[in-house]
Amino acid sequence: RQIADGLQKGRLSKQSAGKGSRAWEETAALEEHLQSCLAKAYEYRDNHFATHPEYYACYFEMRLGQCEILDSLQEEMGRLRRFPVQAEAVAEILAYVAEHVMERNEPAAQLERLGRLLEDMKRSPLPVSREEFENRAVLYHILMELEEFLKLKKKFVELLTEEQVERYWGKPERQDEKSFRK
């Protein structure tokens, strides 16, 4: 969320996005917490005869993968020298995705919105300077990383059984039942 805010305001710097920044420290703390949760999930799996002991282990593995992508996103943000016009739209989608990071979420809507943004960027005029080209390339790479972030969640959701969805998610919060389950 902090990265999206900095990008929107055009005030992202090495201090706000790079190593040692508050966002970086929060991501490191999150990663440490997820590692602890994953260890507990493995312990739970290994000590229970429950019908779905893998759920928590798979969930925290997915979140750790997403955490690695957050690290990469922060590094990319630190490479921006100037903020192209497209930075505003990238900040908006980052903020939008941040609002929807929750356990019971199927990311189809976020992937669709990201796809529309990528199409819009393809239609924008070509950069006129090398610096603009490089900064737009960084933004594009950020969007590719964001797509991977969402695809990790999508894969997790697709691998859930109906029983796991019912047990851990209760009544599914899905926009389209058919898109959720094959």
Model-derived features: where do they sit?
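Canonical alpha-helical transmembrane segment with a positive-inside/aromatic-interface signature
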Residues: 1-23
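Soluble C-terminal extramembrane regulatory/interaction domains of multi-pass membrane proteins
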Residues: 3-8, 38, 45, 51-182
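A general boundary/transition motif marking the beginning of the first structured unit of a protein
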Residues: 18, 22-25, 85, 134
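Surface-exposed beta-loop-beta
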Residues: 18, 44-47
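Alpha-helical segments in soluble extracytoplasmic regions
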Residues: 26-37, 66
